[in-house]
Regions:
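Receiver (REC) domain active-site loop signature in two-component systems and cognate sites
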Residues: 58
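Two-component/phosphorelay signaling modules centered on CheY-like receiver
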Residues: 14-32
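Active-site residues of response regulator receiver
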Residues: 52-55, 83
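Acidic catalytic/metal-coordinating carboxylates
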Residues: 35-36, 62-65
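A short, hydrophobic beta-strand element within the central beta-sheet of small alpha/beta folds
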Residues: 76-86
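C-terminal output helix
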Residues: 89, 107-117
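Alpha4 helix (beta4-alpha4-beta5 surface) of REC/receiver domains from two-component response regulators
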Residues: 65, 86-101
């Protein structure tokens, strides 16, 4: 049997991690949660991650820095950004670097579902 794709969730807010994890699992994907970008980068799940949902504003390494670190490591993981501070210049920077989504918190679960379906569903 094929293993479900892994969606990693990086957010410093416990409630966001719990909500996103529940949503991801309801779609049949495996969810791995991390409270920081640094924890994700050190995780054994890094190379198995099929899609990443990440906050922009976090203590320590922020979401854009995480995106840059992944690119520097040649990791081509599709990233969906969620943020409580949706600045246009940040969105443009994230998308220019390859983000597949950029959404404001509180995020509508349907937009995350649509984005995950686009990235992870075959055909």
């Amino acid at each position: 049997m094929l293993r479900a794709p892994i969606v990693s969730i990086v957010d410093d807010d416990d409630s966001v991690r719990a909500a996103m994890s529940s949503l991801v699992r309801s779609l049949g994907y495996e969810a791995c949660v991390f409270a920081s970008a640094e924890a994700f980068l050190e995780s054994p799940h890094l190379h198995d991650t099929s899609c990443l949902i990440a906050d922009i504003q976090m203590p320590g390494m922020n979401g854009l820095d995480l995106q840059s670190a992944l690119r520097a490591r040649q990791e081509r993981i599709p990233i969906i950004f969620i943020t409580a501070f949706p600045e246009e210049r940040i969105r443009q920077r994230a998308e220019a670097a390859g983000a597949v989504g950029f959404f404001s918190k509180p995020v509508d679960g349907r937009v995350i579902i649509d984005c995950l379906d686009t990235v992870l569903r075959p055909g």
